[in-house]
Amino acid sequence: MSASTAAPARDRLRIAIQKSGRLAEPARSLLAACGLSWRQSRDKLFCYGESLPVDLLLVRDDDIPGLIADGVCDLGIVGQNELEEQAAERRGNGLPAAYHAVRGVGFGQCRLMLAVPEEWDWQGVAQLAGKRIATSYPAILADWLERQGIEATVVELSGSVEIAPRLGTADLICDLVSSGATLAANQLKPVELVMESEAVLAGAVREPADARAGLLAMLLRRMDGVLKLRDSKLLMFRADQDNVDALRRLLPDADPLVQLPDDGNGVLRLQTMCHGAVTWQRLEELERAGAQGLMVLTVERSLA
């Protein structure tokens, strides 16, 4: 099916995620936190949604953008780098991407970087002129080189990019970097950022207008709640009215304080949602400022 052909009406939402790899488990955990559960097929590539009419397709990450563009899947969780690589490739072929990043999902952070042999004295991007650069992301790299005004040869490799300089097939590489350990093991050093990336929820530019529309809206609302609460804690404490302003200043990343019914002795009962780390040091600061009976609670679900 071409990207311009309307997808057939369906009453079940279909989401593509990585079958295996670094995004597979976090993606399934995120969707499970949204209340989804599945029954896996014998071939282990299709998971039938049981709690909601939302099915999973387990595929290679580089298949996900195309499945969305062709209307086979409504959504996918995929690296932004993979999404942009295929979008750039489609633009180069005169085709619309037909998909977009709906939102980041809070994991899979990495950087697409140029890396050179450790012995290079790196002076800047002007050194790239005439060089051979090995990468698995040729379209992104070609776009970046064009913006920099650099003429270089892009050597496309599907894997093991980091050994290309040692094999003599390239002078340097452009590859994803998380910790930098793989580069160091191959006597390479990162020198220039090409793209920041993370896992994203991707969807079709044209959203479904049939029964899937309501499912999509519900899933996105649940996902917003899960992502908002991922690093959030409910903080409850008591305090005198005179100390409230000082306590509020110690909670810049928290929602407005909510006053609960007091017990009649003039001490206020307060609670707030903190969206940053609630460390022991932070609790001790609050205590010194007048907070009493501090409690930190995990919140599993929220509909705002």
Curated annotation (Swiss-Prot):
Its cofactor is Mg(2+). The keyword Metal-binding applies. One of its GO terms (biological process) is L-histidine biosynthetic process. InterPro entries: ATP-PRT_HisG_long (IPR020621), ATP_PRibTrfase_cat (IPR013820), ATP_PRibTrfase_CS (IPR018198), ATP_PRibTrfase_HisG (IPR001348), HisG_C (IPR013115), N-reg_PII/ATP_PRibTrfase_C (IPR015867). Belongs to the ATP phosphoribosyltransferase family. Long subfamily. Pathway: Amino-acid biosynthesis; L-histidine biosynthesis; L-histidine from 5-phospho-alpha-D-ribose 1-diphosphate: step 1/9. Keywords: Amino-acid biosynthesis, ATP-binding, Cytoplasm, Glycosyltransferase, Histidine biosynthesis, Magnesium, Metal-binding, Nucleotide-binding, Transferase. Its EC number is 2.4.2.17. It catalyses: 1-(5-phospho-beta-D-ribosyl)-ATP + diphosphate = 5-phospho-alpha-D-ribose 1-diphosphate + ATP. This is ATP phosphoribosyltransferase. It is found in: Cytoplasm. GO terms for molecular function: ATP binding; ATP phosphoribosyltransferase activity; magnesium ion binding. Catalyzes the condensation of ATP and 5-phosphoribose 1-diphosphate to form N'-(5'-phosphoribosyl)-ATP (PR-ATP). Has a crucial role in the pathway because the rate of histidine biosynthesis seems to be controlled primarily by regulation of HisG enzymatic activity. SUPFAM superfamilies: Periplasmic binding protein-like II. Feedback inhibited by histidine. One of its GO terms (cellular component) is cytoplasm.
